[in-house]
């Protein structure tokens, strides 16, 4: 049975639109857990556009399942992670002008810097996942870097504009997930996953966890957080 981790970034996006105190992503995370979510994900960006330092601090105290902190591999963020001590850190690329994370980490070009970041996080007792494109080369580098997990970027699959293209991208995800598991890495998937396309991805037995945010938060606006999470859980393990 695959696990479902809920990203609550966009609850904070609504809050920050008015620089208000609500909706609170901490409350949303608690509701997601009550509905059966296996983990909570937040991305503390360098520009603090949605999730704030306070959110991560309070979530560390309140999350009962697993807290996964997405972040860039910068000195500032690594120190924050060492102070907060989430169960897992997912290292992601970050550009200030992007609306959301646009692609996977270039682990090939930045292997040296990532090696140092991963070593530091491991010394702090934190498991590491790398958000990477579905590329066998990147899977192999992640293994060489001794990351515990990879999160396979499913954005190209989700945004495919034809059935043929979607099938091609799906096969890339399948191949990457199989290789990750063969090498002993945990295989997660995330980005662009919704209530329709998850029906494809749930058929990949090697994927152990789905990280889903925008689709669930958008659905929650209409039907409530708990129902939105329960519906996605039913699809993930249908």
Curated annotation (Swiss-Prot):
The record marks 151 as: Transition state stabilizer. InterPro entries: Aldolase_TIM, PyrdxlP_synth_PdxJ, Pyridoxine-5'_phos_synth. Its main location: cytoplasm. Keywords: Cytoplasm, Pyridoxine biosynthesis, Transferase. It is found in: Cytoplasm. GO terms for biological process: pyridoxine biosynthetic process. One of its GO terms (cellular component) is cytosol. 1-deoxy-D-xylulose 5-phosphate binds at residues 9-10, 45, 50, 100. It catalyses: 3-amino-2-oxopropyl phosphate + 1-deoxy-D-xylulose 5-phosphate = pyridoxine 5'-phosphate + phosphate + 2 H2O + H(+). Its EC number is 2.6.99.2. The keyword Transferase applies. 3-amino-2-oxopropyl phosphate binds at residues 7, 18, 192, 213-214. The active site is at residues 43, 70, 191. One of its GO terms (molecular function) is pyridoxine 5'-phosphate synthase activity. Pathway: Cofactor biosynthesis; pyridoxine 5'-phosphate biosynthesis; pyridoxine 5'-phosphate from D-erythrose 4-phosphate: step 5/5. PANTHER family: PYRIDOXINE 5'-PHOSPHATE SYNTHASE. NCBIfam families: pdxJ (TIGR00559), PRK05265.1-3 (NF003625), PRK05265.1-5 (NF003627). Catalyzes the complicated ring closure reaction between the two acyclic compounds 1-deoxy-D-xylulose-5-phosphate (DXP) and 3-amino-2-oxopropyl phosphate (1-amino-acetone-3-phosphate or AAP) to form pyridoxine 5'-phosphate (PNP) and inorganic phosphate. Homooctamer; tetramer of dimers. Belongs to the PNP synthase family. This is Pyridoxine 5'-phosphate synthase. The gene is pdxJ.
